[in-house]
């Protein structure tokens, strides 16, 4: 086994074709991290000119100290049963990490627990410290240890039928409601950033500046690994649909009124059907007024939701999503998710990753909403083997990885107690 000097294109091709490859190991992903102070180095090992393992090493300086952290996000990309390749990757990583004054090498492979026996044993044998099997969104990890994944290598009907029944009905309703899902371009990021700001204010989290999303799009779109989707509501088109539905409802009422006059047996049923139709008419009249007001203000329509869809070979990722507070009954997110899954499948993906979650959290957990949303899309829980540290500077590692988190947790507890008072 020997070190190899390969191009960025060769590195990315290996990552995209390997079962343990991941978006975060693509060379263009490293470019997106520069804004937050990370820089990258890359290593590769192989035999007789054939690549057998690669890794992208991210480095970030420790504040006020002449040291760095070496972080191999979702790496190494290697067959973990191949001890020789794994050992060679670690040797190469140590050499570079020491030159960059790293206090530790941190990895979190894209290897699931049920397939990770070799990885666990071999990494521990090499001296890696395993950080345990904690909850998926534990703050002790950089990347979530658990994500929710939908298999999408199936036809449209099979994909839709893989969703939970209630969610399946919502998707079908969303398809009828009259929104349009667009694959947008860089200009659309302005709209997406505005939607993200609205989402953050509604759900209580800090949002990124537009430059952050431009950075991701610019780095990965050229290779087809980043796409922006937006969902638009056209008022004129939907006013026509509402008018058609109103006409149908009035016709239905007339039909049941006629039956009431000709059949006493059907009178009760007919009255119920008439009442139901009248309720629908009232709702549609309200909707029509809202759409007419929208048409006056925004005759070209408005965008209701958006998302960034990412790729790494046969894996696709729902990375960021945002939505408006208006016209939520049109279920734009449901239309968008189904459309993005189909697009991902048509462009070579077999899986669609919704991102991090805990495993069936309690209803009072802050993470329950995420779990509840992600579990209805025909997903399975992808539980990774977790995070590992290879310590290069024990005193500094002890200070940064163990003492500092304890102090932070203590400050949080004190702050919460003071707030209660």
Swiss-Prot record:
InterPro entries attached to this UniProt entry: Acyl_CoA_acyltransferase, FEMABX, PG_Glycine_Bridge_Synth
UniProt catalytic activity: beta-D-GlcNAc-(1->4)-Mur2Ac(oyl-L-Ala-D-isoglutaminyl-L-Lys-D-Ala-D-Ala)-di-trans,octa-cis-undecaprenyl diphosphate + glycyl-tRNA(Gly) = beta-D-GlcNAc-(1->4)-Mur2Ac(oyl-L-Ala-D-isoglutaminyl-L-Lys-(N(6)-Gly)-D-Ala-D-Ala)-di-trans,octa-cis-undecaprenyl diphosphate + tRNA(Gly) + H(+)
The protein's enzyme class = transferase
Q: What is its EC number?
A: 2.3.2.16
Q: Organism's domain of life?
A: Bacteria
Sorted alphabetically, the keyword list is:
Acyltransferase, Cell shape, Cell wall biogenesis/degradation, Cytoplasm, Peptidoglycan synthesis, Transferase
Gene Ontology process terms (BP): cell wall organization; peptidoglycan biosynthetic process; regulation of cell shape
Q: Which cysteines are joined by disulfide bonds?
A: none
Subcellular localization, as worded in the UniProt entry:
Cytoplasm
Entry GO terms, CC: cytoplasm
Q: Does the keyword Transmembrane apply?
A: no
In terms of Pfam families, this protein maps to:
FemAB
- PROSITE patterns associated with the record: FEMABX
Give the Gene Ontology MF terms in alphabetical order. Answer: aminoacyltransferase activity
Which family does the entry's similarity section mention? Belongs to the FemABX family.
Self-association and partners = Monomer.
Q: What does this protein do?
A: Catalyzes the incorporation of the first glycine of the pentaglycine interpeptide bridge, which is characteristic of the S.aureus peptidoglycan. This glycine is added to the epsilon-amino group of the L-lysine of the membrane-bound lipid II intermediate (GlcNAc-(beta-1,4)-N-acetylmuramic acid(-L-Ala-D-iGln-L-Lys-D-Ala-D-Ala)-pyrophosphoryl-undecaprenol), using glycyl-tRNA(Gly) as donor, in a ribosome-independent mechanism.
Q: What name is this protein filed under?
A: Lipid II:glycine glycyltransferase
Q: Which gene encodes it?
A: femX
């Amino acid at each position: 086994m020997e070190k190899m000097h390969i191009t960025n294109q060769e590195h990315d091709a290996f990552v995209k074709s390997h079962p343990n490859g991941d978006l975060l190991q693509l060379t263009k992903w490293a470019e997106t991290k520069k804004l937050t102070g990370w820089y990258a180095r890359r290593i590769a090992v192989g035999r007789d000119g054939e690549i057998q393992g690669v890794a992208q090493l991210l480095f970030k300086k420790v504040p006020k100290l002449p040291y760095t952290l070496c972080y191999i996000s979702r790496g190494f990309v290697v067959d973990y049963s191949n001890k020789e390749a794994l050992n060679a990757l670690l040797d190469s990583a140590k050499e570079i990490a020491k030159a960059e004054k790293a206090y530790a090498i941190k990895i979190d492979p894209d290897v699931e627990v049920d397939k990770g026996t070799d990885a666990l044993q071999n990494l521990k044998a090499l001296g890696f410290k395993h950080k345990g099997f904690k909850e998926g969104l534990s703050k002790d990890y950089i990347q979530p240890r658990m994500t929710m994944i939908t298999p999408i290598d199936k036809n449209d009907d099979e994909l839709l039928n893989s969703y939970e029944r209630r969610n399946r009905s919502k998707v079908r309703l969303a398809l009828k409601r009259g929104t349009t899902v667009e694959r947008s371009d860089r200009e659309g990021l302005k709209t997406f950033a505005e939607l993200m700001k609205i989402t953050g204010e509604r759900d209580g989290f800090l949002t990124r500046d537009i430059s952050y999303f431009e950075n991701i799009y610019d780095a990965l779109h050229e290779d087809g690994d980043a796409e922006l989707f937006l969902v638009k509501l056209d008022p004129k088109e939907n006013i026509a649909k509402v008018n058609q539905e109103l006409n149908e409802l009035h016709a239905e009422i007339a039909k049941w009124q006629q039956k009431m006059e000709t059949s006493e047996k059907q009178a009760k049923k007919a009255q119920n059907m008439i009442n139901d139709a009248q309720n629908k008419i009232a709702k549609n009249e309200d909707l029509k007024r809202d759409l007419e007001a929208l048409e006056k203000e925004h005759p070209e329509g408005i965008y209701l939701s958006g998302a960034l869809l990412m790729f790494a070979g046969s894996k696709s990722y729902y990375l960021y999503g945002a939505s408006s507070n208006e016209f939520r009954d049109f279920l734009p997110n449901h239309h968008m998710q189904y459309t993005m899954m189909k697009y991902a499948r048509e462009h070579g993906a077999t899986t669609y990753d919704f991102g991090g979650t805990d495993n069936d959290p309690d209803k009072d957990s802050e993470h329950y909403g995420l779990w509840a949303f992600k579990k209805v899309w025909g997903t399975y829980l992808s539980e990774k083997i977790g995070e590992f540290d290879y310590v290069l500077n024990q005193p500094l590692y002890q200070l940064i990885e163990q003492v500092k988190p304890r102090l932070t947790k203590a400050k949080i507890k004190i702050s919460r107690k003071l707030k209660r008072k």
